[in-house]
């Protein structure tokens, strides 16, 4: 059975059929208007979580280069506010994954498309994002031997679809083929 999730703009879908487990439903729990799970609407979440044999991939998708994107020229993925918001999605989603028993090492992947985006700007975003994720924390706490996070990547859709591991979960235009 095919397992595909469509991103919030309805223009791209990710095929998670090859995953051991996956979800796009963390948001449903965190933003429950009836507060069934507590008053936790302040929590942020990644768009997709994908379990591989070795990792849990926490995937955040932002595409300011699609037709109809609101003010793409104003989108600045390197701003302090944007970086902190994206990093918060990793931390907040980790709680839900822990409760689900998904305790494999994490990889945070930020799929980022925007008008001025290129591999150099994505690398700069990655380096700034890495400073906000728990890499330093886990390296300074000795004697435990556990990791919260193994890697962070900031990739374009094309880079996602050509990555040796990530291409197993193709990201494609709805009704089309990968670009």
Question: Over which residues does each language-model region extend?
Answer:
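Residues at beta-strand starts and edge strands
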Residues: 44, 55, 104-106
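Conserved catalytic cores of phosphodiester-cleaving nucleases, focusing on short active-site segments
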Residues: 48-50, 55-65
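Catalytic cores of nucleic-acid endonucleases
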Residues: 64-115
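Short, mixed-charge, low-aromatic patches
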Residues: 41-50, 81-87
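Short, low-complexity, polybasic intrinsically disordered segments
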Residues: 107, 111-164
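Short linear motifs at secondary-structure transitions and domain/linker junctions
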Residues: 20-25, 33, 81-88, 128
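Basic, amphipathic N-terminal segments that precede the first structured/catalytic domain
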Residues: 1-46, 53, 143-146, 167-179
């Amino acid at each position: 059975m095919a397992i595909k999730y469509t991103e919030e703009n309805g223009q791209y879908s990710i095929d998670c059929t090859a995953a051991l487990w996956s979800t796009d439903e963390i948001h449903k729990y965190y933003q429950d208007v009836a507060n069934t799970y507590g008053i936790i609407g302040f929590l942020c979440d990644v768009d997709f979580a994908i379990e591989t044999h070795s990792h849990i991939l926490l995937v955040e998708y932002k595409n300011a280069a699609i037709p109809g994107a609101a003010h793409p020229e104003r989108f600045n993925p390197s701003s302090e506010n944007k970086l902190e918001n994206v990093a918060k999605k990793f931390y907040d989603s980790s709680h839900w994954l822990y409760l689900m028993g998904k305790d494999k090492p994490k990889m945070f992947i930020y799929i980022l498309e925007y008008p001025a985006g290129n591999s150099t700007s994505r690398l700069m975003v990655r380096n700034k994002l890495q400073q906000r994720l728990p890499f330093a924390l886990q390296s300074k706490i000795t004697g435990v031997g556990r990791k919260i996070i193994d890697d962070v990547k900031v990739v374009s859709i094309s880079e996602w679809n050509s990555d040796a591991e990530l291409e197993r979960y193709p990201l494609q235009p709805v009704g089309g083929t990968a670009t």
